[in-house]
């Protein structure tokens, strides 16, 4: 499944319980079309004690959300935006903001 965002992109959640939150993409899972965003869709995981973590306990971590629920955030126009692709003269393919024309 094609995913329109990449790792380290800043995105805005456009639907669901975390609607309106902004965060950085930590991981992209193209096989399932999901992304993990920092500070979004937090779940509690019950961790058993092991050699690395002797204490164990309940930890809070980010769970994956569908990539269709996030939109790329443009730093120039300070809004969530759709993107288009543009070929530069040197043959490089870049992503462009549809609202202001800024390249990502």
From Swiss-Prot:
Family membership noted in the UniProt record: Belongs to the universal ribosomal protein uL24 family.
Pfam families named among the record's database cross-references: KOW, ribosomal_L24
GO cellular component: ribonucleoprotein complex; ribosome
Subunit note: Part of the 50S ribosomal subunit.
Function (record text): One of two assembly initiator proteins, it binds directly to the 5'-end of the 23S rRNA, where it nucleates assembly of the 50S subunit. One of the proteins that surrounds the polypeptide exit tunnel on the outside of the subunit.
Protein name (record): Large ribosomal subunit protein uL24
PROSITE patterns associated with the record: RIBOSOMAL_L24
Ribonucleoprotein found in the keyword field: yes
GO molecular-function terms, A-Z: rRNA binding; structural constituent of ribosome
Taxonomic lineage: Bacteria, Bacillati, Bacillota, Clostridia, Eubacteriales
GO biological process terms held by the UniProt record: translation
Source species, domain of life: Bacteria
Gene: rplX
Keywords: Ribonucleoprotein, Ribosomal protein, RNA-binding, rRNA-binding
PANTHER family to which the protein is assigned, alphabetical: MITOCHONDRIAL RIBOSOMAL PROTEIN L24
Cited InterPro entries: KOW, Rib_uL2_dom2, Ribosomal_uL24, Ribosomal_uL24_CS, Ribosomal_uL24_KOW, Translation_prot_SH3-like_sf
Coiled-coil regions listed: none
Organism: Clostridium perfringens (strain 13 / Type A)
């Amino acid at each position: 499944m094609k995913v329109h965002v990449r790792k380290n992109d800043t995105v805005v959640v456009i639907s669901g319980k975390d609607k309106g939150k902004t965060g950085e993409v930590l991981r992209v899972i193209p096989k399932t079309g999901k992304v993990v965003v920092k500070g979004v869709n937090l779940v509690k995981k019950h961790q058993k004690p092991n050699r690395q973590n002797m204490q164990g306990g309940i930890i809070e971590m980010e769970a994956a959300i569908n990539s269709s629920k996030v939109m790329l955030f443009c730093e120039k126009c300070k809004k969530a935006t759709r993107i288009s692709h543009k070929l530069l003269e040197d043959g490089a393919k870049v992503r462009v903001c549809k609202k202001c024309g800024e390249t990502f």
